[in-house]
Amino acid sequence: MNTIDKTIEEVLRLAAEHFKVQRDQLSPDDDFFKKLGINSLQALDLLTRVEQHFHIELPDYELQGVTDFRTLAQRIQSRL
């Protein structure tokens, strides 16, 4: 498993834990708004948790248009 795959898997695990769903219900290309039925405030909660977990800060401009786990993981990787 390469680095981006590990990051994707960790993001999926964090999302599943945060929203109390089974990890196997989520896939990298899922739109998290649609798949989890969340709103923008709930997405911000997840992003805060992700930033804390990876010890990074993702600027707002890097998150515009990010709605799937794979793209979020790519943004995280760019900060590690």
What are these regions (language model features)?
Residues 42:
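Two-component histidine kinase catalytic core, primarily the HATPase_c
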Residues 2-38, 47, 52-80:
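Phosphopantetheine-dependent thiolation modules in NRPS/PKS and related acyl-activating systems
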